[in-house]
């Protein structure tokens, strides 16, 4: 597979710049992986059991894959995606794999193709392209090695040279898998992150019951504003005891508010009573982002804001299959106006880190880079989700560096559920950054020694610093 094994993958076609990119990449390609934000399952590392069949490992959990197939008429149930009503779905891994292989051509030119080919070649030693004619052969190869000890989760963690990985758990999670990891004596560093969406977003399903549960597990009165905030503080401390260095917030917008305590208390009371006023529900989410930022100022958790996704765009798919089924769509997102209440409150705090992400690329140069380029509390997260492709990463660097520089960004995070693809995702990011730095050197805008230093920072150091790992 020349596209994957070629040493010049994603490097500039011009000879001088390509040579520079090669040298930069050679200096960083084997650096440890810092994965400060993602969605791998801590159960894997806790139990360290063999992964299931190839389809359950590589296809069924990956919405990058099944959303593309669904767009071309393949039913989710035919890909093994479980329905909420318990209706029958395909359970035979080989059948699912064959269906995927028959449609693999759909991924030509996409980052998913790059990542998946990398996994086939570098993890499983497969050199033949995947298609209908090779599907069974590849399935058998992968199914066989998945039973080997050196393909269990902890062994792969070590083989991937992962220095630290963060999972993401909801505020109500008991973190039993993280406790099991800690008690096992295994030295792999797996930390959690605090994701309170289910107890800060009134539109989240079961919100009122979630707040009741939050009160039960903390002993706080979540019927009162003060007790509700205390419950968050207690849960954040609990998550920190299992290594958390960050919280994560997936709000529909970046809107924030900074109400007086009396106004916030009254708003909370109305929300707790089940207010259906959309303006009040939006205002509550906005206020809670600011409250979370103030808590981060006090307890040191890095605050990540992932706004601008219209979640569950298809109500029929959501009702049948639930969340995270490929129907989250980017929207236009305002930051300058939306974040001002939060920034007025804590934006000048030098010991606070708020990492901003976007699905709206038009905001890079107009809003995000100028904001992060002046407010001490702000940093820019890397190209995210729909934009963590080679083209998206290039656009990110080109549109933010001139105003925010490199050191107001946080390196790379893979933000994935697909554990086997983590080395591929980091490799693509490292190659893209080396190509970008090589261009700056070739244009005499950067010295070569500076480019080597920056390559290491972007691949490893900036993520460790920003996420306090």
UniProtKB/Swiss-Prot annotation:
Q: Tell me which Gene Ontology terms the entry assigns under biological process.
A: D-galacturonate catabolic process; D-glucuronate catabolic process
Q: What is its EC number?
A: 5.3.1.12
Record-linked SUPFAM superfamilies: Metallo-dependent hydrolases
A GO molecular function term, named singly, is: glucuronate isomerase activity
Signal peptide: which range, if any?
none
* Catalytic activity annotation: D-glucuronate = D-fructuronate; aldehydo-D-galacturonate = keto-D-tagaturonate
Gene3D superfamilies to which the protein is assigned, alphabetical: Metal-dependent hydrolases, uronate isomerase, domain 2, chain A
> Which cysteines link up through disulfide bonds?
none
Pfam families attached here?
UxaC (PF02614)
What keyword terms does UniProt attach to this protein? Isomerase
Q: What highest taxon heads this organism's lineage? A: Bacteria
Record pathway: Carbohydrate metabolism; pentose and glucuronate interconversion
Query: What family is it from?
Result: Belongs to the metallo-dependent hydrolases superfamily. Uronate isomerase family.
Q: What is the designated name of this protein?
A: Uronate isomerase
| Species whose genome carries this gene | Mesorhizobium japonicum (strain LMG 29417 / CECT 9101 / MAFF 303099) (Mesorhizobium loti (strain MAFF 303099))
Q: What is the lineage of its organism?
A: Bacteria, Pseudomonadati, Pseudomonadota, Alphaproteobacteria, Hyphomicrobiales
Gene designation: uxaC
């Amino acid at each position: 597979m020349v596209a994957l094994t070629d040493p010049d993958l994603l490097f500039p076609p011009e000879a001088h710049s390509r040579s520079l990119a090669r040298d930069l990449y050679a200096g960083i390609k084997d650096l440890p992986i810092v994965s400060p934000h993602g969605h791998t399952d801590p159960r894997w590392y806790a139990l360290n059991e063999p992964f299931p069949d190839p389809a359950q490992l590589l296809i069924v959990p990956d919405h990058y894959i099944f959303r593309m197939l669904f767009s071309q008429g393949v039913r989710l149930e035919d890909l093994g995606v479980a329905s909420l009503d318990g209706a029958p779905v395909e359970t035979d891994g080989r059948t699912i794999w064959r269906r995927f292989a028959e449609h693999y051509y759909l991924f030509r030119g996409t980052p998913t193709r790059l990542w998946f080919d990398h996994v086939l070649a570098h993890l499983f030693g497969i050199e033949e392209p995947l298609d209908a004619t090779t599907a069974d052969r590849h399935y058998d190869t992968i199914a066989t090695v998945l039973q080997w000890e050196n393909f269990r989760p902890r062994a792969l963690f070590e083989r991937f040279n992962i220095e630290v990985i963060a999972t993401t758990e909801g505020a109500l999670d008991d973190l039993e898998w993280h406790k099991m990891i800690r008690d096992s004596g295994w030295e792999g560093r797996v930390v959690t992150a605090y994701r309170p969406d289910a107890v800060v977003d009134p539109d989240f399903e079961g919100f009122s019951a979630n707040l009741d549960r939050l009160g039960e597990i903390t002993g706080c009165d979540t019927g009162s504003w003060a007790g509700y905030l205390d419950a968050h503080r207690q849960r954040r401390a609990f998550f920190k005891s299992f290594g958390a260095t960050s919280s994560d917030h997936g709000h529909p917008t970046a809107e924030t508010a900074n109400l007086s305590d009396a106004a916030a208390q009254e708003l909370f009371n109305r929300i707790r009573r089940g207010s259906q006023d959309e303006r009040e529900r939006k205002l509550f989410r906005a206020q809670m982002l600011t409250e979370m930022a103030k808590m981060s100022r006090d307890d040191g958790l890095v605050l990540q804001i992932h706004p601008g996704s219209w979640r569950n765009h298809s109500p029929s798919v959501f009702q049948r299959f639930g969340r995270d089924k490929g129907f989250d769509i980017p929207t236009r997102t305002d930051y300058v106006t939306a974040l001002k209440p939060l920034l007025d409150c804590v934006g000048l705090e030098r010991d606070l880190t708020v990492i901003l992400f976007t699905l709206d690329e038009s905001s890079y140069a107009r809003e995000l880079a100028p904001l992060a380029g002046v407010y001490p509390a702000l940093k820019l997260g890397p190209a995210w989700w729909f934009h963590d492709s080679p083209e998206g990463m290039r656009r990110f660097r080109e549109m933010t560096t001139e105003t925010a520089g490199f050191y107001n960004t946080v390196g790379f995070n893979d933000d994935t559920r697909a554990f086997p693809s983590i080395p591929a995702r980091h490799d693509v990011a490292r190659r893209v950054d080396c190509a970008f730095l090589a261009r700056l050197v070739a244009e005499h805008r950067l010295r070569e020694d500076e480019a080597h230093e920056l390559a290491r920072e972007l691949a490893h150091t900036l993520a460790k610093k920003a996420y306090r790992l």
